[in-house]
């Protein structure tokens, strides 16, 4: 008997991207834009905030 898996998880191209259609519990591990901007701001010591100090 083959069990139905609502998470497809099939490879969709040759560089191993995987489809997670049907899996709302799986999140994209990439940071959101505001989080990425905070990281970039914190990594650059030449930002305007650090020059004011």
Swiss-Prot record:
Q: In which tissues is it expressed?
A: Expressed by the venom gland.
Matching entries from InterPro entries are given as:
Natr_peptide, Natr_peptide_CS
Where located?
A: Secreted
Q: Which GO terms describe its molecular function?
A: hormone activity; potassium channel regulator activity; toxin activity
One GO cellular component term of this record is: extracellular region
Protein family: Belongs to the natriuretic peptide family.
Share an example GO biological-process annotation for this protein: regulation of blood pressure
Name used for this protein in its record = Natriuretic peptide DNP-2
Record bears the keyword Protein biosynthesis: no
State the protein's purpose: Exhibits vasodilator, natriuretic and diuretic properties in animal models and human tissues. Acts by stimulating cGMP via the natriuretic peptide receptor 1 (NPR1). Is a poor agonist of the atrial natriuretic peptide receptor 2 (NPR2). Is not degraded by neutral endopeptidase (NEP/MME). Binds to atrial natriuretic peptide clearance receptor (NPR-C/NPR3), which may be responsible of the removal of DNP from the circulation. Increases calcium uptake and induces histamine release from rat peritoneal mast cells.
Question: Which cysteines form disulfides?
Answer: 7-23
Q: Which residues form the propeptide?
A: 39-53
Query: Which species expresses this protein natively?
Result: Dendroaspis angusticeps
Keywords assigned: Calcium-activated potassium channel impairing toxin, Disulfide bond, Hypotensive agent, Ion channel impairing toxin, Potassium channel impairing toxin, Secreted, Toxin, Vasoactive, Vasodilator
